[in-house]
Amino acid sequence: MKQSLILLAAIIFSLPAIAQETTKPVKKNRKEEKRERINAMIRAEEEGVIAYKKHFLFGIKLNTDGYGILFEKGYAKSIRKATLFQLAISERKHQKEIKQSSFLTPNSPFIYGKLNFFYPIKLGVQKQFLLGNKSNKNGVMISGNVGGGISLGLLRAYEVEIDDSTSSGRKSVRYDSPDSLKFVDALNRNPSGPGLFKGWSHLKMTPGLYAKTAVRFDYGRYNELVSAIEVGLEAEFYSKKIPQMLYNKEKQFFFSAFFALEFGKRK
């Protein structure tokens, strides 16, 4: 009985060591297979064969005057050129926006003079050109992107909730309404900023065009998963001036720099 227990204990304690020894070749084989696959792609590209013909990615974008998200579908035309189709949704802030809140009342933060939330929705096409690539190490691929398209500017009314003696105590007002004087005097009426669902019933749309240029740094070109950063400039022009802030000049033309983190998959 004792001999059986000793034998069983020896087997149990030796299992991790056996498992470790068996997993080492597996890990090594996987690395070797990946290295061989990358080398095969590099040799194929030297002969003009495209490693991945298309990709899809999602990005988080920070502009100098806002933020947003983007979606992209790309098609490789050659090892050096690709066509990109992009959809970007963002919120553009005015430089004079200042959030105010009071410690005396639990109201939502309020921006005095803000007239509208401004949401540009851009749909466009870009051309991508390979600028540099450390292909022998599956390193960083550097590419330049140039393009543009249409932009639809959505204006959501900025509704402010204030104290009002003519209603049940509190009332939502906006500048483009008969209550414009109360909107202007909101600071003296215990104001509260709008919630996420306020102002959509007074949505307005302004069409426009945009142009964009950028440089993209794609890490691991021969990996199926895309992991990249992009920096660039973009300009937008709308068919009429965009009212964003009270007592400030309205603009038709917007120019900004941006930084984006992008993730996706190649096929």
PLM ranges: what are they?
Residues 60, 69-75, 123-129, 148-152, ...:
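Residues on the lipid-exposed face of transmembrane beta-strands in outer-membrane beta-barrel proteins
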Residues 45, 55-57, 72, 107-113, ...:
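Extracellular loop and loop/strand-boundary signature of outer-membrane beta-barrel proteins
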Residues 48-54, 76-84, 131-142, 220-229, ...:
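Short loop/turn motifs that connect adjacent beta-strands in outer-membrane beta-barrel proteins
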Residues 1-49, 267:
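Cleavable N-terminal export/targeting peptides
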Residues 38, 45-53, 99-109, 187-196, ...:
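Flexible, solvent-exposed coil segments and beta strand-coil junctions
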Residues 52-56, 63-67, 81-83, 117-121, ...:
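Residues that define the transmembrane beta-barrel architecture of outer-membrane proteins
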Residues 89-122, 126-137:
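Outer-membrane beta-barrel translocator/channel fold
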Residues 145-229, 234-246, 250, 263-265:
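Outer-membrane beta-barrel transmembrane domain signature
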